[in-house]
Structures are given as C-alpha cells and as structure tokens.
C-alpha cells in the first residue's frame, strides 16, 4: 500500500499537490520544498549570486511552495537583489531590474491557475538600509493592491485559510510609529539572527505577538559544501522526528568556499536526494538551490 501511495504522489501533478492535503492541516506543519534566493535566475555576478535556473512560475510548477525573497528599496518600488547583486527578468542586464510586481505576477498567475495551493513568502531586505521602509512599500504598494491574495495574520494558518493566497512572512523590522496592527503584518520573523559564524548548531526564533510561535532554523551558510552537509544539514535531518510543537526551517544552500552556489549544490543536492526521509516525520520547510523534480517530489511525498 505504501509503495502505491508513493507512486501516486510521484505521478501526480506537482503543480497542485496541496489539493490532496486535508485543509485542516497547518501549512507550516507540512514538509514544504522551498527555493533560496528564488529570483536569481538572471543576476549580476552569477558565479557567486545565481542560486536558481528557473523563474518563479516554473519553480512553483515544480512543486516549490516557499519562496525566499530578497529586496532593496528604490524610490517607491521594491527591486530584487541577492546582496549587492541586482536580479533581472532576462539575461540582458541592461534591462530594468526585476520589480516586486514581476515576482507577484508569477505568483498570482500560478494561484489563479491552481487555487488549491498556497505560497509561503519569506520577505527580507537584503540591502542593510531602509529596513522599515521596505515593509511600508511592500504593504502599501503591493499587498494592499490585491489584499484578497494575501494571508497577513501573525500566526500559522490552516491550509483551508490560505488556499489561493500568499502567506506573508516578514523578516524585517517595521516602523512602529505608523500604527500598524502587529497581528496583521505577516508572521513576524524580524528577530531572525543571521547565522554568519561557522558553528553547526541551529538557532531558535520566537515570533512576537500574542500568538508567539517557535521556529528552529538551520542556515549555516558560511560552510563549504562537504562540512555543510556533514556538520550542519545531515545532523539536523538526523534529529528530526514527529511534530513536537516547534516549526522547522532547513536551508540546504551554502555560500561557503569559492566554487559558488551551483557547484556547491552539485555536492549537497545528491546527498540530500540519497538521504532517507521518513514518511511520518516532520522536516519543515526546506530551502534549496537549483532544485529538481526529484528533490521536490522527495519532500512532497513525505506528506502522504
């Protein structure tokens, strides 16, 4: 029976895999494929900055349901970046820098075509300046243009609450003088601590507000690929078990060494692909560089 279920999951349409999930499940208690620095298909300094070879729509079609979004503010717009590197819609780097509206066009199109699905949208200012302004722009110039497309409460939603919507996770501070309702500004990840040191231990993140929830985050991105897998990723996977009340975020990506994300992923992704995941275990949201159909399917099928 188990083999039949696995086979059915493999052949089902990855674009609508959440249609098979009971809507009474919390979204963040599912095992979800995600993409790290998802907008970097076309990006400056590609050897060190390119983390994806597909656009947003193609990633979602492949089964990805969590997007790691990095932005900078330009006037009254939000532009896509990976650190100092600008992201574009095409190979032509003399074209206009990718705008948040371009990203959302992919998301809205996908959700319109697949209303059973939801997208976890982790939003971060990657420019280290105007942190609060980035949230102002995101809320007023983008989210409020299509509020029916967004889930912005500061709690983990049930799938039925979030189908056809984008779940907003705010990884930046906001201007507290603006009178925003903390309960309606997205799941609050503003206490996130960058894991910049070469220490393998994951970190705890507690959200703010009356519905405080705890996340365990593994994002030790300073390691070279081999120790990254052996000292950080694999031990974290080994520690997984059934749901115990803490939400999990696990990054397979790494910026360590000089080989760049693509070459690093050629070491880490096959390691993860050959790692045995248990059907009844909770692995959380797994962010990847250069995911394949095999990788997304591996994560998705643990939900069935």
Where are these regions (language model features)?
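A cross-family signal for N-terminal binding/gating loops and helix N-caps
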Residues: 71, 111, 127-130
């Amino acid at each position: 029976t188990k083999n039949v279920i696995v086979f059915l999951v493999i052949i089902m349409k990855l674009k609508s895999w959440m249609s098979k999930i009971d809507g009474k499940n919390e979204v963040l208690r599912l095992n979800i494929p995600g993409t790290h620095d998802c907008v970097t298909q076309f990006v400056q300094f590609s050897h060190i900055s390119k983390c994806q070879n597909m656009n947003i729509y193609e990633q979602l079609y492949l089964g990805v349901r969590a997007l790691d979004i990095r932005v900078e503010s330009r006037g009254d717009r939000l532009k896509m970046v990976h650190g100092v590197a600008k992201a574009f819609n095409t190979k032509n780097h003399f074209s206009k820098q990718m705008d948040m509206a371009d990203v959302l066009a992919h998301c809205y199109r996908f959700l319109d075509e697949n209303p059973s699905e939801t997208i976890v949208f982790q939003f971060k200012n990657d420019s280290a300046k105007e942190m609060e302004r980035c949230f102002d722009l995101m809320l007023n110039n983008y989210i409020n243009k299509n509020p029916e497309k967004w889930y912005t409460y500061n709690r983990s939603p049930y799938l039925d609450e979030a189908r056809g919507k984008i779940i907003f996770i705010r990884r930046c501070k906001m201007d507290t003088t603006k009178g925003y309702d903390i309960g309606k500004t997205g799941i609050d990840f503003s206490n996130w601590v960058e894991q910049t040191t070469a220490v393998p231990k994951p970190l705890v993140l507690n959200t703010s507000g009356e519905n405080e929830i705890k996340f365990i985050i593994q994002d030790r991105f300073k390691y070279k690929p081999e120790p990254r897998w052996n000292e950080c990723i694999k031990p974290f996977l080994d520690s997984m078990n059934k749901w115990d009340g803490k939400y999990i975020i696990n990054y397979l990506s790494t910026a360590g060494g000089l080989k760049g994300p693509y070459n690093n992923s050629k070491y880490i992704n096959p390691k993860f692909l050959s790692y045995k995941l248990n059907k009844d275990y909770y692995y959380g949201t797994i962010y990847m560089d250069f995911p394949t159909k095999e990788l997304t399917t591996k994560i998705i099928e643990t939900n069935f």
